[in-house]
UniProtKB/Swiss-Prot annotation:
A Pfam family of this chain: Ribosomal_L19
Superkingdom of origin: Bacteria
HAMAP family reported for this sequence: Ribosomal_bL19 (MF_00402)
Protein family membership: Belongs to the bacterial ribosomal protein bL19 family.
GO CC terms in record: cytosolic large ribosomal subunit
Organism: Leifsonia xyli subsp. xyli (strain CTCB07)
InterPro entries (alphabetical): Ribosomal_bL19 (IPR001857), Ribosomal_bL19_CS (IPR018257), Ribosomal_bL19_sf (IPR038657), Translation_prot_SH3-like_sf (IPR008991)
Keywords for the protein's UniProt record, in alphabetical order: Ribonucleoprotein, Ribosomal protein
Reported function: This protein is located at the 30S-50S ribosomal subunit interface and may play a role in the structure and function of the aminoacyl-tRNA binding site.
Phylogenetic classification of the source organism: Bacteria, Bacillati, Actinomycetota, Actinomycetes, Micrococcales
Gene: rplS
Disulfide linkage: none
Single GO biological process annotation from the record: translation
SUPFAM superfamilies: Translation proteins SH3-like domain
Protein name in UniProt: Large ribosomal subunit protein bL19
Amino acid sequence: MHILDQVDAASLKQDIPAFRAGDTVKVHVNIIEGSRSRVQVFQGVVIARSGEGVRETFTVRKISFQVGVERMFPVHSPVIDKIEVVTRGDVRRAKLYYLRELRGKKAKIKEKRDN
């Protein structure tokens, strides 16, 4: 098992900001189309974070043209260029799956105040 731990440690990213459920993030994703590559930004609210180490993932939800879109990202994926935290959310839950049923202003998350 020690060899697997070393391989896992080698593939961990170091430049990941601290974020949790309720935070609004911008995820910069590298997309390769044929011979060209471009960066696509996916901005939304983190509704869940699960796993640990190399297998850690997080789910981001956004509303696009009145349709909810959720995307799951591995935290340490080489496809992710960078993760920016836009705002910090003030929530009391680790998983915000209840946001799927809420519409409009009810789906808004309060911003955490800095003291």
